[in-house]
């Protein structure tokens, strides 16, 4: 099979595209000559695969890191201190939790959240989120069981270089993305399995081509591909979907064509949702090879947060939103020593989930700080 062979795949019958609604620009009425950005909630519903699927909710928050006030300045009843200036933008997933009957109460609970931000270091620079106060509405979510969250500094913080030692910082969530989805989506791609490489395996990767709508003079445009004469810019993100093994049976040819048919028979459908931040979803709607099954749950689904796969691209999605333009399946040797002497086999136009094709952010982009 030639390199970059184009093999058309069946597209979903329903081409109506749903999208994550952008946060509109909503400012408060002037108070003492100042206006403030109002907290906002975006709701997305992902339908279950079958009637018996249990529903849960995912909460992801976007907001700002500010230096904590030290109270060494003058304060009076008539002159109350305002918020400290924004240091940088930040994302913090609250994780999965129970169904919420009154999602509008989430915004009321944001002011009661107290989350401190500190730096640390191991092999890489790290950010620590210390949850010291959490309102009742968030108690059933993953964040309530994990009062100290440690992540790589580039993962959730827009500009970690602005956070200094000797200063206390707090995270102020402002925008909330609430996703109703089946429990079958509560699975991230298994990172340990993704690192396994062997000569008796073939790796299947997904190349997701994302389109960003931004101006030519935008700073992020320098890190993206200009789409010829068309509007917008494009980014290529690779996701490791699974490995499949080569067989040792005699009198049978196990070439690129054989493994290509395996890929086509799997019929992967790709989507883009907001769960752990912008997240790529994969659903195997066809035949699952036995050796690929450990990479998915029992319903053939897996999720790949962009903050894990490509943190820089994830941050662009905070600022400008994005949509899936095309998905290609890549067949590659698993063992690194075999890659230099082989071609990548490309299967173009993997079907995209029409219900989860877009990821849009705020019209006003506070996350560019």
Swiss-Prot record:
UniProt subcellular location: Virion
Pfam family, one: Matrix_Paramyxo_C
This protein's GO CC annotations: viral envelope
Cross-referenced InterPro entries: Matrix_C, Matrix_N, Matrix_Paramyxo_C, Matrix_Paramyxo_N
GO terms for biological process, alphabetical: virion assembly
Function: The M protein has a crucial role in virus assembly and interacts with the RNP complex as well as with the viral membrane.
Name of the featured protein: Matrix protein
Organism the protein comes from: La Piedad-Michoacan-Mexico virus (LPMV)
Gene (name only): M
């Amino acid at each position: 099979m030639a390199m970059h062979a184009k093999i058309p795949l069946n597209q979903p019958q329903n081409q109506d595209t749903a999208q994550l609604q952008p946060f509109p620009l909503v400012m408060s009425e002037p108070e003492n000559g100042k206006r403030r950005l109002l907290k906002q909630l975006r709701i997305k519903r992902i339908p279950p695969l079958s009637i018996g699927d249990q529903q849960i909710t995912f909460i992801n928050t976007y907001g700002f890191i500010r230096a904590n006030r030290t109270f060494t300045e003058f304060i009076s009843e008539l002159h109350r201190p305002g918020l400290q200036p924004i240091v940088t933008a930040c994302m913090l997933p609250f994780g999965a939790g129970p169904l919420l009957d009154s999602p509008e109460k989430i915004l009321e609970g944001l002011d009661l959240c107290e989350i401190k931000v500190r730096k640390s270091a191991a092999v890489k620079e790290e950010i620590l989120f210390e949850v010291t106060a959490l309102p009742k509405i968030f108690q059933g979510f993953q964040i309530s069981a994990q009062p100290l969250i440690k992540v790589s500094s580039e993962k959730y913080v827009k500009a970690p270089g602005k956070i200094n030692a000797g200063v206390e910082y707090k995270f102020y969530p402002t925008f909330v993305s609430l996703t109703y989805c089946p429990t079958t989506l509560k699975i991230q791609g298994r990172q340990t399995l993704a690192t396994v490489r062997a000569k008796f395996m073939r790796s299947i990767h997904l190349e997701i081509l994302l389109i960003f709508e931004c101006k030519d003079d935008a700073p992020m445009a320098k890190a993206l591909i200009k789409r010829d004469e068309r509007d917008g810019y494009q980014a290529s993100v690779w996701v490791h979907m699974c490995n499949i093994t080569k067989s040792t049976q005699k009198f049978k040819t196990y070439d690129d064509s054989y493994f290509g048919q395996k890929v086509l028979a799997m019929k992967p459908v790709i989507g883009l949702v907001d769960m752990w931040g912008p997240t790529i979803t994969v659903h195997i709607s066809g035949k699952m090879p036995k050796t690929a099954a450990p990479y998915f749950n029992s319903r053939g689904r897996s999720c790949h947060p962009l903050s894990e796969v490509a943190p820089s691209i994830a941050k662009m999605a905070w600022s400008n939103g994005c949509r899936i333009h095309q998905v290609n399946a890549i067949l590659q040797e698993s063992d690194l020593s075999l890659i230099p002497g082989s071609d990548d086999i490309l299967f173009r136009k993997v079907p995209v989930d029409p219900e989860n094709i877009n990821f849009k952010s705020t019209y006003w982009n506070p996350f560019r700080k």
